[in-house]
Amino acid sequence: MLYTNDLQGTVDFYTQTLGFTCKSISKELDWASLTFGDIDIMVSLPNEHIPFDKANFTGSFYFLTNNADIFWEQLKDKTSICYPIEDFEYGMREFAIYDNNGYLLQFGHELAF
């Protein structure tokens, strides 16, 4: 579950920018379910008993793709970039962006050697 202070903005970012489909949204429960292929993500406003000002996840969400370059071309001019696409010595070609909440999203594919 990803917490957000802007449920509709997050649904819009994931659907309009990243290409997810909104499977379900409940304004009463302040919750939404999003899907992209085999990926399912749930987002919600934080519960009252959970202190939350902004995204504070200390890691990243890694999307392993068949071709990160395709996603890079689609996203590079529409998102906040953490680092541009590049090849890494550990055998991955990847890039990273921030979503509308500040969560770090990485996209990569394995390099053929």
Question: What do the predicted segments below correspond to?
Answer:
Residues 21-64, 72-98, 109-113:
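Vicinal oxygen chelate
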Residues 6, 12, 87-91:
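Residue-level preference for alpha-helix termini and adjacent loops
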Residues 9, 68-72:
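Short, conserved charged micro-motifs
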Residues 10, 14-15, 75, 99-102:
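Conserved active-site tyrosine of GNAT-family acetyltransferases
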Residues 1-11, 59-61, 111-113:
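N-terminal beta-strand motif that seeds the catalytic metal site of vicinal oxygen chelate
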